[in-house]
């Protein structure tokens, strides 16, 4: 009995010593974490060019389509993907499209018919929006927010989507199912289309409706895509809007993350304007942001 008690005492002493040693070991500071993250991002930037100027058509992929390929599992029914494309468009009906006099007429033929607009399910409405003929216009402005406000003004599909209470749910499900390799192989503008989907998710109506669970699901999906992009030296995708989506979704849903951001004018500017100036965000703040996402 005495021998057993002695063993127990020894185990307790060893456990206490291990715990004390763990406390004594220097923990990596937020600033150190931030410096490391900044270094890795700089390395990524030198390897990857931003596909801001990606051509409207990927000439190297003759099998890709101009319409949005619906990811498997998004709809609970089989459907003709092209039903969500305007009857007049630059690829199917180039002569009719080229005959349009100006951008006003292009926008007019690109609207969703009124009888469909109010009766279509939100899941399918999202697909109409993904196929908007002029969706790339959102990239022609100084900020993504300004670009999406322009698309909202020009396109009835986006305006209707922003009124749907389940819009966030549909967009998040589509985003989670958006496989980078598969979509790029099938979609002639897959990289820009991902940015467009992320830009929709960043619209105020969507962000303001997010639950904490939805925000965390988005952050996890963003992290998965970011990891794949930065670890693929030949990836045609950019992480810029993906990073922004992860940040603004957490800012909208988490008081803890909002507190970290609000303590830094540079980080707050990034959230509010979508403008990232790395030198305006300290290593300490960057480290706190990275640590926050690692602990999700």
Q: Locations of the language-model features?
A:
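Sec-dependent signal peptide cleavage junction
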Residues: 20-37
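Hydrophobic membrane-insertion alpha-helices, especially the h-region
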Residues: 11-20
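N-terminal Sec-pathway targeting helices
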Residues: 1-12
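Non-catalytic all-alpha helical scaffold/repeat segments
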Residues: 38-40, 47, 58, 66, ...
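Residue-level detector of intrinsically disordered/flexible regions characterized by low predicted structural confidence
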Residues: 4-5, 29-30, 59
């Amino acid at each position: 009995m005495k021998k057993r008690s002695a063993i127990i005492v020894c185990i307790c002493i060893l456990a206490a010593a291990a715990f004390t040693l763990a406390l004594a070991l220097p923990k990596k500071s937020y600033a150190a974490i931030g410096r490391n993250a900044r270094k890795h991002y700089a390395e990524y930037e030198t390897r990857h060019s931003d596909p801001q100027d990606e051509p409207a058509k990927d000439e190297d992929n003759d099998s890709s389509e101009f319409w949005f390929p619906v990811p498997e599992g998004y709809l609970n029914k089989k459907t003709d993907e092209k039903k969500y494309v305007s009857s007049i468009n630059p690829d199917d009906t180039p002569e009719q499209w080229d005959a349009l006099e100006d951008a006003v007429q292009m926008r007019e033929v690109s609207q969703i018919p009124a009888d469909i607009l109010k009766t279509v399910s939100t899941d399918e409405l999202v697909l109409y929006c993904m196929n908007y003929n002029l969706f790339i216009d959102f990239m022609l402005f100084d900020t993504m927010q300004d670009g999406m406000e322009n698309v909202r003004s020009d396109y009835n599909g986006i305006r209707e989507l922003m009124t749907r209470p389940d819009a966030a749910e549909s967009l998040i499900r589509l985003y989670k199912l958006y496989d980078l390799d598969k979509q790029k192989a099938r979609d002639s503008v897959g990289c820009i289309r991902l940015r467009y989907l992320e830009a929709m998710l960043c619209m105020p109506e969507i962000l303001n409706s997010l639950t904490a669970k939805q925000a965390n699901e988005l952050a996890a999906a963003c992290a998965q895509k970011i990891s794949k992009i930065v670890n693929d030296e030949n990836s045609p995708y950019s992480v810029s809007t993906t990073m922004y989506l992860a940040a603004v979704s957490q800012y909208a849903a988490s008081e803890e993350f909002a507190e970290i951001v609000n303590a830094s004018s540079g980080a707050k500017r990034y959230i509010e304007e979508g403008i990232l100036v790395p030198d305006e965000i300290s290593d300490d703040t960057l480290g706190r942001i990275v640590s926050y996402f690692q602990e999700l």
